[in-house]
Regions:
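A broadly conserved sequence feature marking short terminus-proximal activation segments
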Residues: 1-30, 130-131
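Residues immediately within or flanking Cys/His clusters that coordinate Zn2+
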Residues: 29-32, 39, 46
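Cys/His-enriched microdomains
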Residues: 33, 47-50, 107
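Cys/His-coordinated zinc-binding microdomains
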Residues: 36-39, 53
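Conserved hydrophobic positions within beta-strands
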Residues: 66-68, 98
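Beta-strand/loop nucleic-acid-binding surfaces
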Residues: 93-102
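Short nucleic-acid-contacting surface segments enriched for D/E, G, S/T with interspersed K/R
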Residues: 101-113
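OB-fold/S1-family single-stranded nucleic acid-binding modules
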Residues: 118-131
Length: 131
């Protein structure tokens, strides 16, 4: 079953810590945080590195490419949708929606690319579609 109608998406909460992330999303760019102490990239973007707890992190533009790690299709919703974990080419894994596809043809390890979907009064949300 493919997504035939668009779901109304609530606007994300934007804080001073995530403002750059959402500003980039509005320009169609996906950012991750990278720790300059241990070299690990992470998502959801936050100032403190979850690996070494350093506060020496910087914004890095991600390629927008990844693979599906795991997913589930929610068919009981008014508009069916797929939610899953995508492993980004840069390493971090993010919880996201998989959109604009036939949900019955999704599979783990499938290549995906980022798309940005509008929200109700806020910045767009990064989601993924099969590449």
């Amino acid at each position: 079953m493919s997504e035939t109608k668009e779901r109304k998406l609530p606007a994300p909460a934007v804080s001073a810590e995530t403002q750059a992330y959402w500003d980039a999303a509005a320009k169609g760019k996906l950012l991750v945080r990278k720790c300059t102490s241990c070299g690990q990239a992470h998502h959801y973007p936050r100032t403190i590195c979850p690996f070494c707890f350093s506060d020496k992190t910087e914004w890095v533009e991600a390629s927008g490419k990844g693979t599906i790690y795991s997913y589930s299709v929610m068919r009981r919703a008014p508009v069916p949708y797929a939610i899953g974990y995508v492993t980004l080419a840069e390493g971090p894994r993010m919880l996201t929606n998989i959109v604009d596809c036939d949900f019955d043809k999704l599979k783990c390890d499938q290549a995906v690319t980022v798309v940005f979907k509008p929200t109700d009064g806020g910045p767009p949300l990064p989601m993924f579609t099969p590449a």
